[in-house]
Design a protein with these regions (language model features):
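Structured beta-strand/loop patches that form or line metal/cofactor-binding pockets in enzymes
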Residues: 1-44, 50-54, 323-328
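Conserved, mostly hydrophobic/aromatic
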Residues: 3, 35, 42, 70, ...
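Metal- or metallocofactor-binding catalytic centers and their adjacent structured scaffolds
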Residues: 5, 38-114
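Hydrophobic faces of well-ordered beta-strands that scaffold small-molecule active sites
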Residues: 45-47, 129-137, 158-162, 190-194, ...
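Shared catalytic-loop signature of beta/alpha-barrel
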Residues: 65, 222-237, 245-341
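Glycine-rich, aromatic-flanked loop segments that form ligand/cofactor-binding clefts
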Residues: 98-99, 104-138
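Metal-dependent enolase-superfamily TIM-barrel catalytic cores that perform enediolate-based chemistry
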Residues: 124-234
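C-terminal extensions of enzymes
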Residues: 327-367
């Protein structure tokens, strides 16, 4: 089943609400690159990657050139063997995992379609689970964040990510965590995320001020060592995100006793092939996971949901329905959140059929 063509589109995803994070990071209009692999068997596979500006070592303008550079490896390759193809890509071009993620997702879509299975079954798991969602709250005024949390709690959400640090105001961050915790009551998971934007001192001060509450912290600082110092000083559980991007960094976080939970993002690791290895390591270590991607629409959301659905339920902390935060929807037939949960699509492969009218004209085609 050889790859015969690669088509690329660019879609501007508009956030329903401007998304503010620490250190000047925002999500408003973000460029997503959509990829389709066609094969001589008449089976096509879809991929997507949507890098957030200034967030990770990735940028949207680099996706198409990287994929075009990999064309000699991809054209004619057997798409039914995703990991073999990705190993060849890694040998030909080091790094650029974000661009490779879209390729790997599409390869898994093709291979699981050929097998006649939803991707989660192709990956070896059918736990029949509803996947718990979290709702991410943009870093705005504390009382507004509490209002959003209460509204989402009323809809059934039980996990809340509270963005911190956008205004570099410790007192405001303390209020954000305290008011959201109060708004959702006892039981739901509440965690404050600085996206690497805090110093260890500021994160420690905020953490100690809310240490009497049921709160988890997420990636306050830029390094594992700094995060570990905050974890030790506050005695609050911590989730790592930006610092974990392969099996070696996951082991480093675990050995530093700072990784109570980990964010496994498709484009951060390089696609489904790499993410399932990271997932299996976390299961072996007993670490709960958030299985998602940085940003995106229905294709990347579906890929992450399939990985989540093939993961033992006790290790799935949560997933994210990224496509609910942005417009346009590329496929209106896919599952949506319901009382705090979502399921993976049940069709073969990713189960995604993007609306070509919404994609518009391709920006590149490789024959």
């Amino acid at each position: 089943m050889k790859i015969t063509s690669i088509t690329l589109w660019e879609v501007m995803l508009k956030s329903h609400q401007t998304y503010y994070m620490a250190d000047g990071k925002t999500c408003d209009d973000v460029r997503s690159v959509i990829l389709r692999l066609d094969t001589d068997a008449g089976i096509s596979g879809w991929g997507e990657v949507c890098p957030i500006p200034h967030y990770l070592p990735a940028y949207a303008e680099g996706v198409v050139p990287a994929i075009e550079y990999l064309a000699p490896v991809l054209m004619g390759a057997d798409a039914s063997h995703p990991e073999v193809v990705m190993a060849a890509c890694d040998h030909y071009l080091q790094g650029h995992l974000y661009a490779k993620s879209a390729i790997d997702i599409a390869l898994h879509d093709v291979a699981s379609r050929q097998a006649g299975l939803p991707l989660y079954k192709y990956l070896g798991g059918d736990y029949g689970q509803k996947l718990p969602l979290y709702h991410s709250i943009t870093c705005i005024a504390p009382d507004e964040m509490a209002r959003i949390a209460a509204e989402e709690k009323a809809k059934g959400m039980t996990q809340f990510q509270v963005k911190l640090g956008a205004d570099r105001n410790n007192e405001a961050d303390i209020a954000r965590l305290s008011l959201v915790r109060e708004a959702v009551g006892a039981g739901p998971l509440v965690y404050g995320d600085w996206n690497c934007g805090a110093t260890s001192l500021d994160a420690t001060r905020v953490g100690r001020a809310v240490s009497h509450l049921d709160i988890m912290l997420e990636q306050p600082c830029a390094t594992i060592a700094e995060c570990a110092s905050v974890r030790q000083a506050t005695n609050l559980p911590m989730k790592l995100d930006e610092n974990v991007f392969d099996t070696h960094s996951l082991l480093a976080g675990y050995q530093a006793k700072v990784m109570d939970a980990a964010a496994l993002k498709l484009s951060k690791f390089g696609g489904v092939s790499a993410l399932r290895k990271a997932r299996d390591l976390c299961v072996s270590l007993g670490v709960k996971m958030c299985i998602e991607d940085t940003w995106g629409s229905d294709i990347t959301t579906s890929a992450a949901l399939h990985v989540g659905a093939s993961t033992p339920p006790q290790f799935v902390m949560n997933v994210c329905d990224l496509s609910s935060y942005v417009a346009p929807k590329l496929d209106n037939t896919l599952p949506v959140r319901e009382t705090g949960y979502i399921t993976a699509p049940t069709g073969v492969g990713l189960g995604v059929a993007p609306d070509l009218d919404k994609l518009g004209a391709p920006i590149a085609s490789i024959q």
